[in-house]
Amino acid sequence: MKIDAGLDTGAVYAMRTVPMDDDVTLEELRARLVEVACTLLVDELAHGLAGLPEPEPQRGQPTIAEKISREDLHLDWSRTAVELKRVVRLGHAWTTFRGKRLTVLEAAVAAEESRTDGRRPGALAGTLVATGGGSLELRRVQPESRSPMSADEWLRGVRAGDGERLGTD
């Protein structure tokens, strides 16, 4: 990008499209973008020895995203499973269980809702959590002051009762 006075307004020397699926996390996307950017930079510098191409003006308006706060990463179980999965994909999503912080590292929207039907948001049914719309399946978690582990390992360790709720503390 050519340096310009405005924020993200300079003309572009080169760009690449990076495909992204619905399950990619922020960390995975960051790693993929670094790899693509490094390759693009090396390729363009090699071409630059013969003279840089004329930069093309950017299309459209820049998108400005607000900074993500700690509260934005708090899992509000009254939201839908799809919305909560998006928060988990950002990384460092958290809730509480028995007064302690529980970071949710990996989760999926559950195909099976019957085990959580009629339960209050945050209620556990094994690795499934009832939400405001659908169920979220916990896959990997990190309890406060502990190492990451599978949700099954965590549930065995805390001996969570069926229907016990997350996020009530």
Regions found by a protein language model. Name each.
Residues R59-D169:
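Internal anion-binding site segments
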Residues M1-I64:
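Donor/substrate-binding cores of folate-linked one-carbon enzymes
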